[in-house]
C-alpha cells in the first residue's frame, strides 16, 4: 500500500481543518510498550498477552456500551488484564501492578514529537480525544513531555460512554468550539476512524498494522501508515 492515500475520491476537506484531534492509545502512544518493559517477568507469551490485553480492553468497552454499563477506562483496563493474566496462568500480583503502572507512562511513537511540532508551527490547533479517563491520560501525557502541544485532552468520561458513541465525538464541538467539518480526526483504530467520519469529522486512519479496512459506516478521508505522513497530507511544510 502507499504511505498516504485518498479514500473517498473527493477534493480533500483536510486542507480546511482548523484542529487535529488525535486518539491516544495506539495512535500517539504505543500500548505495547507496557508489556515490552516487563517482558522478562511475563515470559515467552509476552507479545500474545499484549495483543489479547488490547483486544479484550476494546471488546469490554463495546460490551459495556451495549449494556449501558459505563465504567472508567482504568477499571476496564484492569479487568481486561486480569482476564489475560488468568488465560496465561500468571498469578504474580506484582506483574499486574507493574503492567498497570506502565500503562500510565506509555511511550509515544517515535515520529510523534516532531510531527506535533510541525503542525503547531503551522498554526494548527491540537487536541486528544480518548477512551482513557483523566486519571490515566494526565500522567501519561505529562510523562511524555508533550502536554504543552495540546490545547485540550478530552476524555469520554465527560460523556459517560465509550467510542464510537456520537456523544464522545460531540465533546470536541462542545469543548473546542469548532464545527465537525473543521476537525481532522486521527485514529489507528479503524472502527474509531469510521465512527468519527460517520459523525462528520474529516478522518484519517493511521493504519500502523497494514490491516484491511472495516466495512462500517463513515467514509474515511485518507489512510496513512504512521503519523510522519500527516504534515504532508495537510499541506504543512
Go through each PLM region and give its residues:
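Short, acidic loop-to-helix structural element flanking the phosphoryl-transfer center
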Residues: 74-75, 92-128, 135-138, 166
Amino acid at each position: 500500500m502507499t504511505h498516504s492515500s485518498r479514500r473517498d475520491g473527493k477534493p480533500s476537506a483536510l486542507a480546511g481543518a482548523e484542529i487535529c484531534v488525535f486518539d491516544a492509545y495506539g495512535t500517539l502512544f504505543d500500548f505495547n510498550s507496557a508489556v515490552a518493559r516487563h517482558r522478562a517477568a511475563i515470559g515467552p507469551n509476552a507479545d500474545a498477552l499484549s495483543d489479547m490485553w488490547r483486544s479484550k480492553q476494546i471488546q469490554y468497552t463495546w460490551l459495556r456500551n451495549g449494556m449501558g454499563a459505563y465504567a472508567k477506562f482504568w477499571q476496564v483496563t484492569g479487568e481486561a488484564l486480569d482476564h489475560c493474566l488468568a488465560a496465561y496462568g500468571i498469578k504474580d500480583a506484582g506483574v499486574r501492578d507493574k503492567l498497570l503502572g506502565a500503562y500510565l507512562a506509555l511511550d509515544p511513537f517515535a515520529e510523534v514529537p516532531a510531527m506535533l511540532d510541525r503542525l503547531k508551527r503551522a498554526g494548527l490547533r491540537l487536541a486528544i480525544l480518548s477512551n482513557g479517563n483523566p486519571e490515566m491520560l494526565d500522567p501519561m501525557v505529562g510523562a511524555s513531555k508533550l502536554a504543552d502541544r495540546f490545547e485540550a485532552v478530552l476524555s469520554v468520561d465527560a460523556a459517560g460512554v465509550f467510542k464510537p458513541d456520537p456523544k464522545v465525538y460531540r465533546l470536541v464541538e462542545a469543548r473546542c468550539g469548532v464545527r465537525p467539518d473543521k476537525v481532522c480526526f486521527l485514529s489507528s483504530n479503524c472502527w474509531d476512524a469510521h465512527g468519527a467520519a460517520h459523525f462528520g469529522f474529516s478522518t484519517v486512519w493511521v493504519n500502523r498494522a497494514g490491516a484491511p479496512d472495516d466495512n462500517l459506516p463513515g467514509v474515511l478521508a485518507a489512510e496513512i501508515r504512521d503519523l510522519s505522513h500527516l504534515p504532508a497530507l495537510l499541506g504543512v511544510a
